[in-house]
C-alpha cells in the first residue's frame, strides 16, 4: 500500500526525503476510521477506538521512518522543491502545483503530475471527504437579493458550472453536471494535469461515497489541536528513534500513539 511504499522509498533514499505529504492529517484519520465502520467522534471529542489504531499503525510506521512530511504548510510546497513526490490534498490545490521542480541548488526538472482517486484502506469502504463552502446572501435591497439569486442560478447551471469548475479544480455541484457535461468537457481539457484530475473525479463519483464532517461547535478546535499535536508527537518520536536506533531498532509505533493520546486529551 501507500505507506509501505513510503517506507521502501525511505530505505531507497536513505531517509533523506519524505515520500508522502497529507495536507489534512485530521481528515485522513476521520475518513479512515469511518470507512472501517466505526465513529471517529464521540461526545467528548475524538474516539480512540480499535479502528483508530488500525488507521494509526501504517501512518505512524511510515512517519517514524521519515516517509511522511510532518512540517507545516501545504503539499504543493515540498512537491515544487522535490522534497516529496506524492500528496493527498484538496482538488483545488491543482491551481498551485507546478510541473517544474526547483531543487535546492537551483537546478530544475520537468515532471508530470497525475491525479488519482483518494487512496482507501484495503478492508474499508471507498469513502472520501467532501469539503466545500456554501454560498449565502446577506440582507440587502430586494434588487440586490434578486440579482444574487439570478447569479447563483447561472453559476450552478450544469453546463455553465462545468465550464467554470474545470478551470479551477473544483467539483461540479449537480448530478447532471457529472453525468452529462463533465464527460463531454474532458475532451476539451488540454492540460494533462487537469484532465487527469477530472478523470479521477468521474471515477470517484462513480465508485466512492462522500463523507461530510459533522456540525460540532468544537470541530475547529479539535482539528487545530489534532493537526498540531500529531505532527509534534511524531516529530519528537522520530528524532528519539533516530538517536537510539542502534540500541532500539523497533519503531515506537504504539509508544507514539500513547504519547499522542495523552497530549491531545489534555
Show the residue positions of the predicted features.
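Extracytoplasmic/periplasmic substrate-recognition and gating elements
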Residues: 61-67, 104-177
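An extracytoplasmic/periplasmic, membrane-proximal ligand-sensing/linker region
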Residues: 177-210
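Bilobed periplasmic-binding protein-like "clamshell/Venus-flytrap" ligand-binding domains
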Residues: 10-23, 157-167, 266
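Glycine-centered hinge/linker elements that transmit conformational signals in sensory
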Residues: 3-9, 42-72, 118
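Extracytoplasmic/periplasmic solute-binding protein
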Residues: 1-45, 84
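Conserved C-terminal helix/tail region of periplasmic/extracytoplasmic solute-binding proteins
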Residues: 199-266
Amino acid at each position: 500500500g501507500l505507506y509501505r511504499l513510503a517506507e521502501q522509498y525511505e530505505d531507497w533514499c536513505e531517509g533523506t526525503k519524505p515520500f508522502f505529504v497529507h495536507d489534512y492529517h485530521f481528515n485522513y484519520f476521520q475518513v479512515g476510521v469511518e470507512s472501517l465502520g466505526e465513529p471517529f467522534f464521540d461526545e467528548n471529542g475524538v474516539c480512540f477506538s480499535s479502528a483508530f489504531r488500525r488507521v494509526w499503525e501504517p501512518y505512524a510506521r511510515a512517519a517514524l521512518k521519515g516517509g511522511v512530511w510532518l512540517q507545516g504548510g501545504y503539499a504543493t510546497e515540498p512537491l515544487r522543491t522535490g522534497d516529496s513526490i506524492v500528496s493527498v490534498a484538496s482538488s483545488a490545490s491543482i491551481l498551485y502545483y507546478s510541473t517544474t521542480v526547483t531543487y535546492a541548488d537551483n537546478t530544475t526538472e520537468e515532471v508530470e503530475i497525475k491525479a488519482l482517486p483518494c487512496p482507501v484502506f484495503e478492508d474499508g469502504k471507498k469513502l472520501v471527504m467532501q469539503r466545500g463552502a456554501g454560498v449565502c446572501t446577506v440582507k440587502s435591497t430586494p434588487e440586490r437579493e434578486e440579482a444574487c439569486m439570478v447569479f447563483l442560478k447561472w453559476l450552478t447551471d450544469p453546463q455553465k458550472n462545468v465550464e467554470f469548475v474545470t478551470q479551477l479544480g473544483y467539483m461540479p455541484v449537480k448530478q447532471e453536471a457529472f453525468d452529462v457535461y463533465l464527460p463531454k468537457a474532458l475532451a476539451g481539457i488540454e492540460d494533462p494535469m487537469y484532465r487527469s484530475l477530472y478523470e479521477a473525479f468521474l471515477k470517484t463519483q462513480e465508485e466512492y461515497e462522500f463523507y461530510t464532517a459533522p456540525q460540532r461547535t468544537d470541530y475547529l478546535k479539535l482539528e487545530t489541536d489534532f493537526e498540531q499535536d500529531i505532527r509534534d508527537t511524531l516529530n519528537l518520536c522520530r528524532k528519539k528513534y533516530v538517536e537510539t536506533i542502534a540500541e532500539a531498532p523497533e519503531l515506537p509505533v504504539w509508544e507514539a500513539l500513547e504519547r499522542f493520546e495523552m497530549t491531545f486529551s489534555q
